[in-house]
Amino acid sequence: METVVNRGFRREGVNETCPCDTLIDAARNVWRSNNVAGFTKGEAEEATRLMAEDYIVSTVVEETRQRNGGRGKSICFVTGVPGAGKTLVGLNVSVALQNVGASMLSGNGPLVSVLTAALKRDLNKYKKQLKTATNEISVESIIRGAYGYKKEIFEKRLDYHVGEGTVSLKDNAELSSQHVLIFDEAQRAWNKAKMIRPGQSGKKYWQEEKFPFSEPGLLLWDMNQCDWGVFVCLVGGGQEIHTGEAGICEWLRTLEETPELRDWHVYMSDEFKGEVYNSKDGSGKTIEEYRTIFEAQNRLTISKDLHLTACQRSNRTEKVSDFVEQLLNCNADACRTLYNNEIKGKYKIYLTRDVEKAKAKLRERKAETLNKGFVDGQNDEEVRIGMLMSSKAARMRPLGYEIKKESQYKDKVPSWFLDSDDTVVSSDFLEIALNEFFVQGLELDLAAVMWDADLRYNEQNNEWDYFDFNDRYWSAVDKGEQELKRSYMKNAYRVLLTRARIGMVIVVPYGSQVDKTRAPELYDGTYNYLKSLGLEDI
């Protein structure tokens, strides 16, 4: 039983000097060529991504279709450093397996809207030149919003018995045509509490305490109804950024505790372990404990091909994600060593206390890059710049930047990422800063990250202090009961500091002597810490 796939991504003679495209450009290239030509970066970066894609298509899917008399089910976890290309793996596999009903799901609304808008703009622009096969593939079949897919499950397949807390398959149910589902940012899937929270759906049964499923439970229940299926989880370590995000262990807990899923096979790499991937809420078992259970049940396969080891986003060095990790862990010595020995000559990180200097530096670097005619040796018509800040950065308003809520700004996000620099809503205009919820999974070429008093370096204790703003003053987010919230706040900066491909500016404001909510001492410790790492002050 052979799965016929588009083998376009298995190329020979990769150009070792050509870097990766941005995710948006990569998606466009998939669309135009109906394969992944043009995604090259070379050397280890290209190799690890291609091995992951090939392993999923050639090994995971084929073994699953042979298992249990053609009714096998599998789940596959793809891990990697921030910017390693996990989302790109998902897009490539989705396109390659369109004939068996593959689709990529994402609960990241901005990412779905930006990629969908980019592909639709491309279709309108190049429709006559695009391959016939491309025109036959709808944008929506490649990538879908997770919310819409869950709604389809309720409307067409799942019959929930109100008051009983049980489910069954609807009479004359329309089973999913998707045999391969790729779930982006699987660590952000909803827990049960968020699934039943009022306002998440117009369906009354979603708001009932007895509803039995978390988001992983619902999606795996649905695929279990098909004759065969592969569920691919793309996992970003330490990137849960919102309440109600279950963490990756919820997928493993569901597989272990649900009797109907006991025959599912599990694929993962040996790197899928440790604090960065384990859930931070303290509930349930660790990944290591689940691995032991699955091994004893003879339903676990470990493959090195499922971990992406090199960062493609920072295409001048894969060490930037390591640097950010050490920075957030307050390991100054390790940061200095990394920056001076591995990063400084390839990827510039500037530090300033003046937002206007940051904007000027972004424009200067953009002009320099365009004048050279390439980004890391790749011809590029566009260098994307933009302003970023955390969703807790409440006191950037005096500098001209307000927190954007997704409900109020989501329709503008595609324009921010895609419009030209003569449009005021474009990122290049540098008037609007987006936060971690809008940019996770996407990237810029050059970014300015504005660092507010929500995350402050404590010089005395060599640790971070966390604060929320309540319109009058900053209140501490304490250890203990609020530890999960603290991890979300740190993860927000991890996301922001790993968005830029060729360089960034970190802005720590001076503060104000006449505004206690922006007092200089709220910022000085953070600035001093970052300066001690050897970043170039401008």
Model-derived regions, located:
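Accessory nucleic-acid engagement/destabilization modules that flank
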Residues: 1-19
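Conserved helicase/translocase motor-coupling segment
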Residues: 90, 242-245, 274-453, 457-459
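N-terminal pre-P-loop "Q-motif" helix
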Residues: 39-74
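Conserved RecA-like ASCE ATPase "motif II neighborhood" in helicase/translocase motors
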Residues: 133-223, 431-435
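Conserved lysine of the Walker
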Residues: 86
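C-terminal accessory regions
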Residues: 227-230, 432-538
